[in-house]
């Protein structure tokens, strides 16, 4: 039972440490095999599982899509200045502009 527990802890810690650097699994198994270090290994295993669960939840979330159309209302007749040339924007009917697929 102690060997299985140590292997489980090693696997959890290895999963957490993979993001940072290559762990020394033999030293970790030896450290967790001692009774005096059991509480530290429990804390490490708990942190590793919480970290793994957090990563899985982030990957599962899907990104929200942008709306496929934008509605433009009537524009006011304010002057638009581009390169020192004043252009007048006329009012027009509301329209839909699609982005992407037709």
Swiss-Prot record:
Cellular location(s): Secreted
Source superkingdom: Eukaryota
Propeptide: 20-63, 75-90
Tagged with keyword Repeat: yes
Signal sequence coordinates: 1-19
Keyword tags: Amidation, Cleavage on pair of basic residues, Neuropeptide, Repeat, Secreted, Signal
Predominant subcellular localization, coarse grouping: secreted
BP GO annotations: action potential; locomotory behavior; neuropeptide signaling pathway
Protein's UniProt keywords contain Repeat: yes
Cellular-component GO terms for this entry: extracellular region
Function field: FMRFamides and FMRFamide-like peptides are neuropeptides. KPSFVRF-amide: Has no effect on somatic body wall muscle, inhibits contraction of vaginal vera muscle, and inhibits the activity of the dissected pharyngeal myogenic muscle system. Acts as a ligand for the npr-22 receptor in vitro.
Family: Belongs to the FARP (FMRFamide related peptide) family.
Protein name: FMRFamide-like neuropeptides 9
The organism of origin for this protein: Caenorhabditis elegans
Gene from which this protein is expressed: flp-9
């Amino acid at each position: 039972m102690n060997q299985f527990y140590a292997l489980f802890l090693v696997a959890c810690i290895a999963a957490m440490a993979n993001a940072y650097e290559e762990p020394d699994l033999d030293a970790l198994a030896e450290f967790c095999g001692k009774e005096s270090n059991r509480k530290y290994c429990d804390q490490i295993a708990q942190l590793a599982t919480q970290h793994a669960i957090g990563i899985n939840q982030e990957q599962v979330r899907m990104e929200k899509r942008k709306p496929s159309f934008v509605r433009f209302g009537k524009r006011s007749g304010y002057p638009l200045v581009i390169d020192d040339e004043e252009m007048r924007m006329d009012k027009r009917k509301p329209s839909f502009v699609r982005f992407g697929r037709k």
